[in-house]
Swiss-Prot record:
Stored NCBIfam families: PRK02542.1
Family per record: Belongs to the Ycf4 family.
Pfam family, one: Ycf4
Keyword Transmembrane helix applies: yes
Predominant place of localization: membrane
Gene name tied to this protein: ycf4
Name of this protein: Photosystem I assembly protein Ycf4
Biological classification of the source: Bacteria, Bacillati, Cyanobacteriota, Cyanophyceae, Synechococcales
Organism: Prochlorococcus marinus (strain MIT 9312)
Topology versus the membrane: Multi-pass membrane protein
């Protein structure tokens, strides 16, 4: 929940997607590495140096050139996938809570189609804080719905906010929705 636009009867939260600095850095590294491996493979096949560094034309095509070509193809496939995710801003969206109409609208950008979930306040049982520390920490806010076992996450994937900020956002949302707050120990 990157930004909150709060009024007395409405809360709007913008969710960031895959347009993160880390994805740009990894995408750039994959692009350079994938093209480099493909050029090294082609250089070993043709006997001409296509790279400014090193001397890949001296490599044997079998097995080094073929393996480098395979690495290049795999890297470029991952590279195209990652750049496509960045282009469509996968996972971005918004959460909208409207007290006057007693409705919740959750929108996310999907791979092939957008996700749009509309709920009434009556369907919400509580707001849950899902906090786990350790090797792969997770701090997210979710809605527990009546008749559904799994909570509906509201936070964006990969967001790691300070614990105090997550607790404050969860408490403010629970108070706004007039439901209980779960997950605090």
């Amino acid at each position: 929940m990157n930004s909150d636009l709060t009024s007395f009867d409405k809360i709007e939260q913008k969710i960031g997607g895959s347009r993160k600095t880390s994805n740009y850095i990894i995408g750039g590294m994959l692009t350079i590495g994938g093209i480099g491996f493909l050029l090294a493979s082609i250089s070993s096949y043709t006997g001409k140096d296509l790279l400014p560094l090193g001397n890949p034309s001296t490599l044997l095509f079998i097995p080094q050139g073929i393996i480098m070509g395979a690495y290049g193809v795999v890297a470029n496939l991952l590279n195209f996938y990652l750049w496509y995710m960045v282009y469509i801003n996968f996972g971005s969206g918004s959460n909208s809570f409207n007290k006057s109409s007693k409705s919740v609208e959750i929108k996310r950008k999907g791979l092939f189609k957008d996700i749009d979930v509309k709920l009434n306040f009556d369907e919400i049982k509580s707001v849950k804080l899902d906090i786990s520390e350790g090797f792969n920490p997770r701090r997210r806010i979710a809605l527990v719905l009546k008749g559904r076992k799994k909570p509906l996450p509201l936070s964006g994937a990969g967001e790691l906010k300070p614990l105090l900020q997550v607790e404050e956002e969860g408490a403010r949302l629970a108070k706004f929705l007039n439901v209980n707050l779960e997950g605090l120990k």
